[in-house]
């Protein structure tokens, strides 16, 4: 399929862009014509390799721990100073606990870590991107990675689900508050796919994901990939979504259309 330059001229930041959904989205942003893509991540070797492969003049890696707001602010300010603006912020960095985290066995140390990254860290990213976009006065698009789990009760991963529900609340509130500045705020909610993140909860391959979710999605014969999610993000980042804000775009194969069935891991 020929590349369509729907992001031509835009400057984008992708947190968690060194691997998984973030990496694929960063590459797609560049393919769709983004003038510059900044990969903000904590994996210097992987992030640097991705940036170099996209093209050193139009893609940079910057170390960023999103739980440190000053680091987030620095990335945003550096991007604007280096590339002349910030048009798109994809708040994608996230984490999950390595254990089941049922209510009765909730490890609060892990809980705090997950909330610090997924909820607090995402809030810092939205805040700092919005600050710069308001300062520049030309609007912008902010997209956050939520999760299909926010629409269902879960048999485990309680802390993860709570954190992503927080992301959804952030997106809705931010879209209301920032609309006056021409800033759109949306989210994508994918089901699990084989990424370094889902490997921590036992979903290491596409076959693992298909086995886990295939029973509870209505769309058969298609397994979710990072490319599917990246396409959704690219749409929300583009001017084609100019009148879309406060929306959670499900990339879930129809999971929301069916009663949830707890699948044993």
Swiss-Prot record:
Residues 1-30 form a transit peptide. GO terms for biological process: menthol biosynthetic process. The active site is at 160 (proton acceptor). It catalyses: (1S,6R)-isopiperitenol + NAD(+) = (6R)-isopiperitenone + NADH + H(+); (1S,5R)-carveol + NADP(+) = (R)-carvone + NADPH + H(+). Peltate glandular trichomes. It is found in: Mitochondrion. Its EC number is 1.1.1.223, 1.1.1.243. Pfam families: adh_short_C2 (PF13561). Belongs to the short-chain dehydrogenases/reductases (SDR) family. Involved in the biosynthesis of menthol and related monoterpenes in leaves. Can use (-)-trans-carveol and, with a lower relative velocity, (-)-trans-isopiperitenol, (+)-neomenthol, (+)-neoisomenthol and (-)-cis-isopiperitenol as substrates, but not (-)-cis-carvenol, (-)-menthol, (+)-isomenthol, 7-hydroxy-limonene, (-)-isopiperitenone or (-)-carvone. This is (-)-isopiperitenol/(-)-carveol dehydrogenase, mitochondrial. It comes from Mentha piperita. The lineage of its organism: Eukaryota, Viridiplantae, Streptophyta, Embryophyta, Tracheophyta.
